[in-house]
Regions:
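Charge-dense, helix-prone N-terminal extensions
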Residues: 1-120
């Protein structure tokens, strides 16, 4: 039986929250799922929030995703060169999308917590 499609940001969040050490939070004032133990966001609304969501992942993986499934995985100029890729809702391969959300969580969980920002 194949996985149901991820048709909305809420579907992506619901799946991400089934992963270990995750919590619903915000990033840049918008909803996001973070790794609890280090406070880093790995899934977020992104700038194309009506048609996609974003995940944090390494640059090499992003290039492979864009080459092998450009209908699902893409970057706008805002994200190019950064470890972030956008994922269109209702992908033809929802299992791969879930796998990438899991990999994003694992990749982000391996990072140290961000340094505190100075308040102005």
């Amino acid at each position: 039986m194949s996985a149901p499609p991820i048709g909305s940001f809420e579907d992506a969040v619901a799946f991400a929250l089934t992963l270990p050490d995750t919590e619903l939070s915000t990033s840049y004032g918008k909803p996001a799922v973070k790794v609890k133990s280090n406070g880093r966001a790995f899934l977020y609304t992104g700038h194309e929030h009506h048609s996609s969501f974003g995940i944090a992942i390494d640059l090499d993986t992003i290039e492979i995703l864009k080459e092998t499934d450009p209908d699902t995985f893409f970057q706008t100029p805002h994200y190019e060169g950064w470890p972030a890729v956008l994922i269109r809702f209702d992908s033809a391969d929802p299992e791969r999308v879930r796998e990438m959300i899991e990999r994003s969580r694992d990749w982000t969980a391996a990072m140290k917590p961000p340094k505190a920002r100075k308040r102005k």
